């Protein structure tokens, strides 16, 4: 997710065309500290809060990079491809994902965020063994079909942050 979001920003900065849609599954949107879930959801999630800070340090390496330079949430998010984001409500990243979706929307990006309340980081990997995973994967397929002109209906079982595709826009 982090790489996909940062790539969208760099593609736009290079003046290249954006894709029809960007999918972000449980994206890491801030390399610093953000939100209570980052450490408060450690008891639920296989990915732990301290790991996000460690990964941020690895990403910086010996370079002069700051969290702001490496965090999708700190970028100019206007004029990006439409974004469809999925997250688990029990994952450590959920607060920063919500913050990112709100910030992208505030900057004019078309965003849809679906949060499955009892799921952890990248719950999609469970496939057909969990109904929520299967529902999320079905929604991803619908999002891809949306780029071809089909409708993409809101999901009733997920938390909604009032950002959706129901008006024909992402």
Question: Where are the language model's segments positioned?
Answer:
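Alpha/beta-hydrolase superfamily serine-hydrolase fold, recognizing
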Residues: 1-170
């Amino acid at each position: 997710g982090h790489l996909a979001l940062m790539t969208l920003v760099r593609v736009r900065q290079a003046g290249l065309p954006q894709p029809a849609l960007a999918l972000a599954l449980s994206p890491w949107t801030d390399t610093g500290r953000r939100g209570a879930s980052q450490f408060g959801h450690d008891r639920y999630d296989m990915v732990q809060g301290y790991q996000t800070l460690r990964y941020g340090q690895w990403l910086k390496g010996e370079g002069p990079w700051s969290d702001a330079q490496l965090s999708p949430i700190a970028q100019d998010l206007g004029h990006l491809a439409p974004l469809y984001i999925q997250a688990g409500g029990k994952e450590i990243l959920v607060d920063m994902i919500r913050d990112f979706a709100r910030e992208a929307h505030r900057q004019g990006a078309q965003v849809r965020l679906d949060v499955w309340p009892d799921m952890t980081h990248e719950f999609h990997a469970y496939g057909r063994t969990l109904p929520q995973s299967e529902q999320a994967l079905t929604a991803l397929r619908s999002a891809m079909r949306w780029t071809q002109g089909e409708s993409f209906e809101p999901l009733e079982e997920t938390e909604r942050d009032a950002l959706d595709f129901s008006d024909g826009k992402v």
